[in-house]
Amino acid sequence: ILFKMITGKFPSLRLRRNRKNDWSRRLVEENNLSSNDFILPIFLIDGKNKKQPISSMPGVYRYTLDKLCSYVEKAIKNKIPMVALFPYTKTKYKDSFGTEALNENNLVCKAILEIKKRYKNNIGIMCDVALDPYTSHGHDGLIKSNQIVNDETIETLIKQSLLQAEMGCDVLAPSDMMDGRIGK
């Protein structure tokens, strides 16, 4: 009878007993989140000695490269395995082609190099693959004649991905929404 209660079907199998008490729910729960499951987003800003609040996200800040490492150290101390980097690009670096995304001295590339130099492989780095931080029009896709040119955009995204990987990025996270961007 016990075997049927464990492996059988209703009405022999009654799983409500697993949900009856707090201790039993905790015992059989599928997921148990820990800091090992988190990725810490870090928003970057050019300059020195800045921790700039982001008004649309209370309690969240943009950090300059000189402030970045103290924030990364907190992540490592709290056993967060990875950071995700997101740049805030000054208008003077933006153009309609997202050229700054391909600059090996852009903010994200500098941050990757700094984190890898200081922390080696003690923390992973994820980077957003997208052009919107770098385009003057704010779209992920390149625009010609008021249309997104998907295939040309993909070529630029490939170059951006390769650059981030060459700098030491561990995980590429494409968010651009272009058709066919994976697998080319």
Regions found by a protein language model. Give the residues of each.
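Alpha/beta enzyme core
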Residues: 37-39, 46-184
